[in-house]
Amino acid sequence: MTPAGPAQLLIVALVVIVLFGSNKLPDVARSVGRSMRIFKSEIKEMNKDQIESSDQTLKN
């Protein structure tokens, strides 16, 4: 799968603006940002737990 180019990103942005309207767009962006922060922190925590469990396995 190839990464999205500028034309595809522009189309997606236009669709988002049409669907949500320009008034709700800042709220949607804020919500997406919060969700991404939570997702990233959960991934870091999961990786940390996985490393700790593999360290425990190696010690035993």
Curated annotation (Swiss-Prot):
InterPro entries (UniProt xref): TatA/B/E, TatA/E
Membrane topology term: Single-pass membrane protein
Residues that span the membrane, as ranges: 1-21
GO MF, one annotated term: protein transmembrane transporter activity
GO terms classed as biological process: protein transport by the Tat complex
Keyword Signal: no
Keywords: Cell membrane, Membrane, Protein transport, Translocation, Transmembrane, Transmembrane helix, Transport
Main location: membrane
Location in or out of the cell: Cell membrane
Pfam families in UniProt: TatA_B_E
Description of how the protein assembles with itself and partners: The Tat system comprises two distinct complexes: a TatABC complex, containing multiple copies of TatA, TatB and TatC subunits, and a separate TatA complex, containing only TatA subunits. Substrates initially bind to the TatABC complex, which probably triggers association of the separate TatA complex to form the active translocon.
Similarity comment text for this entry: Belongs to the TatA/E family.
Name of the protein in question: Sec-independent protein translocase protein TatA
Source species: Corynebacterium glutamicum (strain R)
Lineage: Bacteria, Bacillati, Actinomycetota, Actinomycetes, Mycobacteriales
